[in-house]
Amino acid sequence: MSAFQPTIKRRESTKIYVGNVPIGGDAPIAVQSMTNTRTTDVEATVAQIKSLERVGADIVRVSVPTMDAAEAFKQIKQQVNVPLVADIHFDYRIALKVAEYGVDCLRINPGNIGREDRVRAVVDCARDKNIPIRIGVNAGSLEKDLQEKYGEPTPEALLESALRHVEILDRLNFDQFKVSVKASDVFLAVESYRLLAKAIKQPLHLGITEAGGARAGAVKSAVGLGMLLAEGIGDTLRVSLAADPVEEIKVGFDILKSLRIRSRGINFIACPTCSRQEFDVIGTVNALEQRLEDIITPMDVSIIGCVVNGPGEALVSDLGVTGGNKKSGYYLDGERQKERFDNEDIVNQLEAKIRAKVARQDPKNRII
């Protein structure tokens, strides 16, 4: 890794806890996702949550639209370890029910669950059980009067919506909450978060909502979340993809890794290849990404197909391979080794070297 390390000054915020996961303050930025199974299908939902746990999800959100789903949530909660957020709209009784069942966070908007006595019931319950709340404002469901006032979703409109809900919790003397102001438009979301970051001290949950499929959604999320994170804004994030939720976690960590905010697993530095490549770089990278998904130890591995950029990248990597005629150069901790890799067997040889280096480090934190 390059010695150049720009300083990102993190926005100051209060700290809350979602289960045992701290959010805000000096806590690491948490990565989360949301299940897309039917919540009433307990077996499928538990299986998906466990798959998210395996790739590093800090928190998982589950939609709880009905009382039947709330009963299913009870069974789900008993079978998983990761903190669960219940996503609830309109019916305050569902929030009270999942609170009985050990929910770790309630995603509600106080303004859309009815009369103040209902809001107070939910807030009092959350306070008694030490359950935080997430206020989630979305450009696609902006209040009708704000749409009429502003003509369309604007940063000011999203901010006003968020502050309405914040005011309700303030009035009830409840401060254990985080807030999101999501939009599918990158610039709208980014500016909304900038305004919100100046207006409140609570932690911010980042997201570019409904970002799209795996490729386009990852790009939009990387651009939008990257802009905010580089400014020190954000305490937890979700990458919203029309894809397997597991990909949301992987992309989320890749964004944090790219900004050197939080690293998990292998960071591959690989060339796009040209006619100078001496071995199959693309195939090597694809194979190693799959084989090494179990490793959580942060590590930079450079895989470069020729000697133009290979040695330079290897010098600042934990491990590196530089393409050569029939055999390729091998670097460890920035130093060239006498050993060379057979170009036909680079995947196996490099995997073995990576796993050996991981094994020499903290054994408690090397693999899933």
Curated annotation (Swiss-Prot):
Which pathway is recorded for this entry?
Isoprenoid biosynthesis; isopentenyl diphosphate biosynthesis via DXP pathway; isopentenyl diphosphate from 1-deoxy-D-xylulose 5-phosphate: step 5/6
Q: Which is an annotated GO molecular function term of this record?
A: 4-hydroxy-3-methylbut-2-enyl-diphosphate synthase activity (flavodoxin)
How many and how are cofactors bound here? Binds 1 [4Fe-4S] cluster.
Catalysed reactions, semicolon-separated: (2E)-4-hydroxy-3-methylbut-2-enyl diphosphate + oxidized [flavodoxin] + H2O + 2 H(+) = 2-C-methyl-D-erythritol 2,4-cyclic diphosphate + reduced [flavodoxin]
Q: What is its EC number?
A: 1.17.7.3
Cofactor(s) for this UniProt protein: [4Fe-4S] cluster
List UniProt keywords, sorted A-Z: 4Fe-4S, Iron, Iron-sulfur, Isoprene biosynthesis, Metal-binding, Oxidoreductase
Asked if Lyase is a keyword of the record, the answer is no
Q: Where does [4Fe-4S] cluster bind?
A: 271, 274, 306, 313
Q: Which domain of life is it from?
A: Bacteria
GO terms classed as biological process: isopentenyl diphosphate biosynthetic process, methylerythritol 4-phosphate pathway; terpenoid biosynthetic process
Q: What does this protein do?
A: Converts 2C-methyl-D-erythritol 2,4-cyclodiphosphate (ME-2,4cPP) into 1-hydroxy-2-methyl-2-(E)-butenyl 4-diphosphate.
Give the family, as the similarity comment puts it. Belongs to the IspG family.
Name this polypeptide is given? 4-hydroxy-3-methylbut-2-en-1-yl diphosphate synthase (flavodoxin)
- Its encoding gene is what? ispG
